[in-house]
Amino acid sequence: MAELACFCYPHLENDSYKFIPFNSLAIKCMLTAKVDKKDQDKFYNSIIYGIAPPPQFKKRYNTNDNSRGMNYETSMFNKVAMLVCEALNSIKVTQSDVASVLSKVVSVRHLENLVLRRENHQDVLFHSKELLLKSVLIAVGHSKEIETTATAEGGEIVFQNAAFTMWRLTYLEHKLMPILDQNFIEYKITVNEDKPVLESHVKELIAELRWQYNKFAVITHGKGHYRVVKYSSVANHADRVYATFKSNNKNGNMLEFNLLDQRIIWQNWYAFTSSMKQGNTLDVCKRLLFQKMKRESNPFKGLSTDRKMDEVSQVGI
């Protein structure tokens, strides 16, 4: 995750802002600079290489002292930064909005995936600039629309029906912020259209999840799509979701946290996110992840008869 201010800076033109991507040498200069505490939140002028991000975001970049940040010296950083600017320059951002826009915390991997979709000649985003920019504005939290299948970050499609598409995420292959754990396996489920879903299509998805992905929990980050993750990584997701939720609220980016369909979401995660929305502390919310929940009445009782036993997946074992 990183703030949009890690990729670009605003330049006032008439009554609105134009966004300009950072270059890697300016960032490198900022990372070595000694800056007064009072100036930590201001864009840094490297004198030679132009404007750099505010020093308060140093930890967002990969250095000798911090291996968890972005690989900002890669060509992928330039591509992501330019794509972000392209999207922001397609809308009007005024002086009253600019701080809020740049403070938004976004998924770096999501943005890299959109670059990969853009470069894929077989992908609809390669052919439609309008859809591409729409996808980026959704990814950076500027649009109130949810991420649907057409505007999704992408990956490898492993399941699809009339209402849902399930993607295997390809973060292991990323350049900007790759997942280093070779055992990483995670999925995302997007709705094909933002409209009510037929019960039969929900039933098809739940049957697929129950039989093929029975070692995984279905959760949500509140953005209108589902994530299918290993139970061992749920606590880590909880920390990230809670931190992003609090950060967005603090910065005035009050986006509605979408709890999604309770029939699909893992019961404990639904309890965690509901508690978070009520304003409880992280410790109080996380306790709900490890409590034994009373089973809800199952609207799809007898669903297991839809599949034969030899279809049970070994994914995640």
Curated annotation (Swiss-Prot):
> Could you state a single Gene Ontology molecular function term?
RNA binding
State the signal peptide span: none
Q: Short name of one Pfam family for this protein?
A: Rota_NS35_C
Gene Ontology CC entries for this record: host cell cytoplasm
Top-tier EC class? hydrolase
Q: Which residues bind ATP?
A: 107-109, 188, 221-223, 227
Q: Which co-factors does it depend on? A: Mg(2+)
Q: Which domain of life is it from?
A: Viruses
Location in the cell reads: Host cytoplasm
> Any idea of its EC number?
3.6.4.-
Q: What family is this protein classified in?
A: Belongs to the rotavirus NSP2 family.
The ranges of region (RNA-binding) come to 205-241
* Protein name (database record): Non-structural protein 2
Question: What does it do?
Answer: Participates in replication and packaging of the viral genome. Plays a crucial role, together with NSP5, in the formation of virus factories (viroplasms), which are large inclusions in the host cytoplasm where replication intermediates are assembled and viral RNA replication takes place. Displays ssRNA binding, NTPase, RNA triphosphatase (RTPase) and ATP-independent helix-unwinding activities. The unwinding activity may prepare and organize plus-strand RNAs for packaging and replication by removing interfering secondary structures.
Task: Give a yes or no for keyword ATP-binding in this entry.
Answer: yes
* Gene Ontology BP, a term: viral genome replication
Q: Mind telling me which HAMAP family this protein's record contains?
A: ROTA_NSP2 (MF_04089)
Catalytic residues identified in the record: 225
Q: Which UniProt keywords are present, listed alphabetically? A: ATP-binding, Host cytoplasm, Hydrolase, Magnesium, Metal-binding, Nucleotide-binding, RNA-binding
Complexes and interactors: Homooctamer. Interacts with VP1; this interaction is weak. Interacts with NSP5; this interaction leads to up-regulation of NSP5 phosphorylation and formation of viral factories. Interacts with host DCP1A, DCP1B, DDX6, EDC4 and EIF2S1/eIF2-alpha; these interactions are probably part of the sequestration of some host SGs and PBs proteins in viral factories.
* Source species: Rotavirus A (strain RVA/Human/Indonesia/69M/1980/G8P4[10])
InterPro entries found in the cross-reference section: Rota_NS35_C, Rota_NS35_N, Rotavirus_NSP2, Rotavirus_NSP2_C, Rotavirus_NSP2_N
